[in-house]
């Protein structure tokens, strides 16, 4: 196997490879760009026009997606997978990965779309670097297809284990065909966002014109302890994408895929913020109308008003000014293109 196929080992060890470019027997080029960043270029005759960005490890303790990308990259380096797409593999937060922690100083996935310019420290610099790597990878060739999957696992359990967040940007419409692709990859639900965000996938969607998704793939566990996380469908789908073997129906069906829309975000304004939910509550737990969800300074209260409301990403420990939870409601998909 080519040494650059061991990107995860290099990243965890903090080593820079001596050889920055290597070729597989079938002519696929592997090029080391930066710590945790490797570009794959297929032979020109096999290039199908897809630019695929696969990122994981934005949170260093979310290991199942990291291990998935490691398996895919090793398959390419062993000449077992034969790419027809350009691919950028990114391990988002190498230092947090080495420590086995979600982040070192602050959450990188709250530092995109310019937010890193308002901050300092290791993660702010890394967020800027990731934006640059993504922008350079996608480049100025608008004739190619751009797709970004940012792979995560959650800090809590979920009633729907594998789900996606689809970013929003003014003037763009969510794609039914992309949702069909996710459904075939084992994704059970998609949250259709309705405002801009400061996450990595929101940056690539809004600023770089990619179809982009944050994929939540189960619960965060340590390296080597992901036997209960079944990513077989996603791994098969990514292999097909990489090799250009994907089959997409002419009339996309979303049968079995649950769609949700954001109703409200719960913003933590002060240290007095209280979230009235059990510490072990699962994502997608339903909340009844009238439920007092949270309280903050100046008599701020969040009371559930929506029918069939569910909560995702409840986290009272976020910094002041950040989102401490999202109330979502079912969506009929009428706005899809």
Swiss-Prot record:
Pathway: Amino-acid degradation; L-arginine degradation via AST pathway; L-glutamate and succinate from L-arginine: step 5/5
Active-site residues per Swiss-Prot or TrEMBL entry: 216
Cofactor(s), by name: Zn(2+)
Cofactor-binding details, from the entry: Binds 1 zinc ion per subunit.
Gene Ontology biological process terms in this record: arginine catabolic process to glutamate; arginine catabolic process to succinate
EC number: 3.5.1.96
Gene Ontology MF term list: hydrolase activity, acting on ester bonds; succinylglutamate desuccinylase activity; zinc ion binding
NCBIfam families in the record: arg_catab_astE, PRK05324.1
Protein name per its UniProtKB record: Succinylglutamate desuccinylase
């Amino acid at each position: 196997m080519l040494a650059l196929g061991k990107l995860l080992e290099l990243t965890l060890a903090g080593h820079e490879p001596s050889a920055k470019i290597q070729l597989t027997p079938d002519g696929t080029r592997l090029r080391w760009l930066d710590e945790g960043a490797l570009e794959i270029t297929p032979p020109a005759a096999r290039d199908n026009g897809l630019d695929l960005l696969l990122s994981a490890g934005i949170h260093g303790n979310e290991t199942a997606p990291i291990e998935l990308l490691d398996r895919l990259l090793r398959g390419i380096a062993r000449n077992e997978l034969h790419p027809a797409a350009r691919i950028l593999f990114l391990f988002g937060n190498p230092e947090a990965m080495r420590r086995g922690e979600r982040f070192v100083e602050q959450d990188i996935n709250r530092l995109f779309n310019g937010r890193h310019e308002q901050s300092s420290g290791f993660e702010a610099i890394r967020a800027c670097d990731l934006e640059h790597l993504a922008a350079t990878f996608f480049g100025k060739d608008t004739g190619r297809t751009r797709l970004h999957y940012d792979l995560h696992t959650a800090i809590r359990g979920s009633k729907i284990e594998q789900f996606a967040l689809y970013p929003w940007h003014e003037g763009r419409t969510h794609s039914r065909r992309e949702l069909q692709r996710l459904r075939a990859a084992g994704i059970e639900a998609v949250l259709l966002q309705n405002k801009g965000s400061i996450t990595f996938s929101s940056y690539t969607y809004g600023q770089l014109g990619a179809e982009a998704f944050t994929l939540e793939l189960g619960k965060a566990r340590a390296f080597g302890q992901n036997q209960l996380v079944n990513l077989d469908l996603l791994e098969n789908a990514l292999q097909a994408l990489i090799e250009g073997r994907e089959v997409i129906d002419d009339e996309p069906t979303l049968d079995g895929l649950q769609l949700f829309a954001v109703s409200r975000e719960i913003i933590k304004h002060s240290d007095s913020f209280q979230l009235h939910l059990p510490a072990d509550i699962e994502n997608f737990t339903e909340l009844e109308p009238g439920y007092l969800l949270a309280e903050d300074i100046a008599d701020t209260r969040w009371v559930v008003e929506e029918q069939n409301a569910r909560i995702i990403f409840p986290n009272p420990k976020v910094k002041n000014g950040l989102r401490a939870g999202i109330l979502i409601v079912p969506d009929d998909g009428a706005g899809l293109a």
